[in-house]
From Swiss-Prot:
Source organism of the structure: Clostridium acetobutylicum (strain ATCC 824 / DSM 792 / JCM 1419 / IAM 19013 / LMG 5710 / NBRC 13948 / NRRL B-527 / VKM B-1787 / 2291 / W)
Enzyme active site: C415
Pfam families: TRAM, tRNA_U5-meth_tr
Residues where S-adenosyl-L-methionine binds: Q290, Y319, E340, D388
Family according to the record: Belongs to the class I-like SAM-binding methyltransferase superfamily. RNA M5U methyltransferase family.
UniProt keyword Magnesium present: no
Highest taxon, organism lineage: Bacteria
Protein name as catalogued: Uncharacterized RNA methyltransferase CA_C0523
Keywords attached to this entry: 4Fe-4S, Iron, Iron-sulfur, Metal-binding, Methyltransferase, S-adenosyl-L-methionine, Transferase
Length: 460
């Protein structure tokens, strides 16, 4: 007999919210049928309108809060409910940190099937000030009714929600956006129409080096000719402190990829300089660099602590990117081998090592699951392996190769608790056990959490 679904689309229901979903949405039940309600807080009774019904769950839109949680707070941003950038501004920051810790723990239990009774689970490392933390912002520029618009995409759409002030990006980026809006209005600059492929300005990228204060502005254009660019350069260079370079990136392809291949430096330098800890990095428009440098330093310090290096160890750094973790590890390691599939990232890693005077690192282009077994075949035995994979997690074959190499310590840095938990479940079957788990809030006001895990070989 087919299960009767107790809710109907477009009807309103009173729902008690007894849990949080993956990105912080409220979860309640009607006759044991699950309903997700965005912006509802655990412990609240709400009225929600059902906007979507599936076989096993429904999605409701928050209409009214009948019983309010003491964990609720007023969002600071006027476009919070329209813009897709933040998910948790309505939740007190202490509760955001608790939510993120619980999210990690639930994944470890449910997906990893791990016994956590002897595992140390630390509180989420948060920020003293959880606003204005992003050192990079990318804003689409579109056109509506003949007028250019700058903002963020509405969640799950390409509709641009105009923004004057974003509370999670560095405040100097907000100042630059207002100047660009002034320039667009004054000189009637065309925004890009993604349907017709016409228009001048496609995207604005702003990068700021927090330690040095240097700022880079990138104008992504559909055409090589940018009318009145001299006026914009004058406005930016006279009104923005710390501006180091203004770059034009030309992208005339019909694509969702933001940056094109060709760049022209319109004013100043093509890179900015920043530090993580003691290490200096040159950052171009295309460089990968963690967007929250304050929390990155805490994350990498935890990785170094978990690695427990004494100066005698060989370390493998899988998915090493531009070598930022490798550099941190090199301080206390005998040798660090970094592997990364993106050739440009490896070139950056080599430059970063050279300019910091580091000689005990070696960087290899290739898939970690292919290159690390080759290193092991050459007789290079790691005492410590660090993995920092993309959201999809580690390849199963890589985990098996690591286990066969039998390092005493594995340090796993993850941006997705679900794939982390899956991989930890595999490692637990290969002779390893989880010792300690440290969630880090890299992205306050959002549902995302970074996690670093200390894993030890079980010596029988």
């Amino acid at each position: 007999m087919e299960k009767v679904i107790p809710v109907k689309k477009n009807n309103d229901y009173e729902i008690y919210i007894d849990d949080f979903g993956n990105m912080g949405e409220g979860i309640g039940k009607i006759d044991n049928f699950t309903v997700f309600v965005k912006d509802a807080v655990k412990g609240e009774k709400v009225r929600a309108k059902i906007i979507k019904v599936n076989k096993s769950f429904a999605i409701g839109k928050l209409i009214d809060i009948i019983e309010k949680s003491q964990d609720r707070t007023e969002p600071v941003c006027s476009i919070y409910k329209k813009c897709g950038g933040c998910q948790l501004q309505h939740l007190k920051y202490t509760e955001q940190l608790e939510f993120k810790k619980n999210k990690v723990v639930e994944c470890l239990k449910r997906i990893g099937k791990l016994d956590l009774s002897s595992v140390r689970i630390n509180e989420t490392i948060g920020m003293e000030d959880p606003y204005f933390y992003r050192n990079k912002v990318q804003l689409p520029v579109g056109e509506t009714a003949g007028e250019a618009k700058i903002g963020f995409y509405r969640e799950r759409s390409h509709e641009i929600i105009e923004v004057d002030k974003c509370f999670i990006q560095d405040d100097s980026a907000n100042e630059i956006i207002l100047l660009i809006k002034r320039w667009i209005k004054e000189f009637n600059i065309e925004g890009y129409n993604e349907y017709s492929g016409k228009g001048t300005l496609r995207h604005i990228m702003i990068r700021k080096a927090f330690k040095t204060g240097q700022i880079m502005l990138v104008l992504v254009t559909n055409t090589e000719n940018v009318p009145h660019k001299k006026e914009l350069i004058h406005m930016i260079t006279t009104e923005i402190q710390g501006i180091k370079g203004i770059i034009q990136n030309i992208n005339n392809k019909k694509t969702n990829v933001i940056l094109g291949q060709r760049e022209i430096t319109l004013w100043g330098e093509s890179t900015i300089e920043d530090y993580i800890g003691e290490f200096k990095f040159n950052i171009s428009s295309k460089s990968f660099f963690q967007v929250n440098p304050i929390q990155t330093e805490k994350l990498y310090s935890a990785a170094l602590k978990y690695a427990g290096l004494t100066g005698k160890e060989v370390v493998f750094d899988a998915y090493c990117g531009t070598g930022t973790i490798s550099l941190f590890l090199s301080q206390n390691a005998k040798k660090v081998y970094g592997v990364e599939i993106i050739p440009e990232a490896i070139e950056n890693a080599k430059i970063n090592a050279k300019q910091n005077g580091i000689e005990n690192t070696e960087f290899i282009v290739g898939k970690s699951e292919e290159e690390i077994p080759k290193l092991i075949e050459k007789g290079i035995a790691p005492e410590v392996v660090v993995v920092d994979p993309p959201r999809k997690g580690c390849e199963k074959s890589l985990l098996h190769s690591i286990a066969e190499a039998s390092p005493k310590t594995i340090v796993y840095v993850s941006c997705d608790p679900a794939t982390l938990s899956r991989d930890l479940g595999i490692l637990s079957e290969l002779g390893y056990e989880v010792n300690e788990v440290q969630p880090v809030d890299m992205f306050p006001m959002t549902g995302h959490v970074e996690t670093i895990v200390l894993i030890k070989r079980v010596d029988k």
